[in-house]
Amino acid sequence: MYIEKGINSLGKFISLMIPLMTILMIVIIVARYFFGIGLTGLQEFVMYLHAFIFLGCAGYVHYKDDHVRVDIFYRDSSNSYKDNVNFILSLFFLLPVCFVIGFYSLELIEMSWKIREVSTEAGGLDYVYIQKTLIILFPLTMILTFAYQLIHKKWK
């Protein structure tokens, strides 16, 4: 199915950014504390990577069912019961939150692109509008994951 393949591909691609982000953080720390060099642009790039990883992988983690949850209510329950609880909670909590985030972020993203928003830091990156565009990844991937699970588990 295309949704499943897309979610898996996006999640695996984005997860490859984690070692890159870690290496860049080490470079920033070494440059600052051993050589006294501040790398503002690189620090902001790491923030961009962090946003990309967090917002882009949310749907993948939800799809894999590896997200953090409190299982005290249903850890010993049957799989069908867990599926029903997950479906109901996703329908009444996840989807509305995703729609609100998606709806209200569109104006923010549009304004950021219109003014070509740049960093307020000296030596910062000139692409804040690209970082703000990443916000929309979260609701999109979460809604796609919900749609896949609805089709796969409920209508199979």
Residues of each region from the PLM?
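Alpha-helical transmembrane segments and membrane-interface helix-loop junctions
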Residues: M1-K156
